[in-house]
A protein has these predicted regions:
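Serine-hydrolase catalytic core recognition
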Residues: 26-186
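Short loop/turn segments that connect beta-strands within beta-propeller blades
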Residues: 8-12, 53-55
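Short secondary-structure boundary segments
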Residues: 1-9, 59-63
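Repetitive beta-architecture junctions, highlighting loop-to-beta-strand starts
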Residues: 2-4, 13, 47
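A short beta-strand motif characteristic of beta-propeller blades
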Residues: 13-19
Length: 186
C-alpha cells in the first residue's frame, strides 16, 4: 500500500510514517501546506477520509460512505489474503471474490486472474465496486475469482522481486500461481 512518510533531507533522523492506517493512502495538501486530506481504503474496506496536520496528527474524520444498501442486496467485499510463493519464503498478497450467495458447503470453479507484469501486477489496492478484470462480475456467475501478485511484478517490492521473471515473461508466474492456489484450497 502507498503511505505518506516524512524524512529529513540532510540524512539525519528517522523516517516517520504520517499515514499509519492499513490501506492505500492518497493525500492532498491544503494550499497553506499545513494540513493533509488523507483518503485511504483497501479492497475489503470502504474509503475513509481524515484530516491531519503535517506532523501526521489526526485532527478529525470526515463522514464515511454508507454501504447499507449494497449489503441489503447481498453485495460482499472481496477477501484479502496472503500466501507463500513457490520458493516457500516470499509473501504474495491477493484478493478473492466470491458469489454473493456463496455457500461454504458447496464447491465452486476457480478462475485465477494472472497478470504479473512486467512493471506491475494486478492486485486491487483500493475499495472498488467493479474491477477492470471483471472479477466481481465473474463471481456473480458462480465462480470464485482469485488474483495475487507474483514474483516478477511490482518494482515497489524490491529489485529481486521485480526482476524475477527477467528473460521468461511467459511462464514465470505459473509456479507461484499454482502454489498459491494449492494453499488457498488446502
Amino acid at each position: 500500500y502507498a503511505r505518506l512518510n516524512r524524512v529529513n533531507l540532510d540524512g539525519k533522523g528517522k523516517i516517520k510514517m504520517l499515514t499509519p492506517e492499513e490501506g492505500n493512502h492518497k493525500v492532498t495538501f491544503s494550499p497553506s501546506g499545513r494540513y493533509i486530506i488523507d483518503t485511504y481504503s483497501r479492497p475489503d474496506q470502504a474509503p475513509r477520509n481524515v484530516v491531519r496536520d503535517v506532523s501526521g496528527k489526526l485532527l478529525f474524520t470526515l463522514e464515511r460512505p454508507d454501504l447499507n444498501n449494497l449489503y441489503a442486496e447481498g453485495w460482499r467485499e472481496p477477501e484479502c489474503f496472503t500466501v507463500k510463493a513457490a520458493d516457500e519464503e516470499t509473501d504474495l498478497y491477493g484478493v478473492m471474490w466470491k458469489p454473493m450467495d456463496f455457500d461454504s458447503t458447496k464447491r465452486y470453479p476457480v478462475i485465477a486472474y494472472v497478470y504479473p507484469g512486467p512493471w506491475t501486477e494486478y492486485i486491487p489496492l483500493d475499495f472498488e465496486f467493479s474491477s477492470p478484470s471483471g472479477a466481481p462480475q465473474l463471481a456473480q456467475l458462480g465462480f470464485v475469482v482469485v488474483c495475487f501478485g507474483n514474483r516478477g511484478g511490482s518494482p515497489y517490492r524490491g529489485r529481486d522481486y521485480h526482476c524475477y521473471g527477467y528473460g521468461n515473461l511467459r511462464d514465470y508466474p505459473l509456479a507461484d500461481n499454482k502454489y498459491g492456489l494449492e494453499q488457498l484450497i488446502a
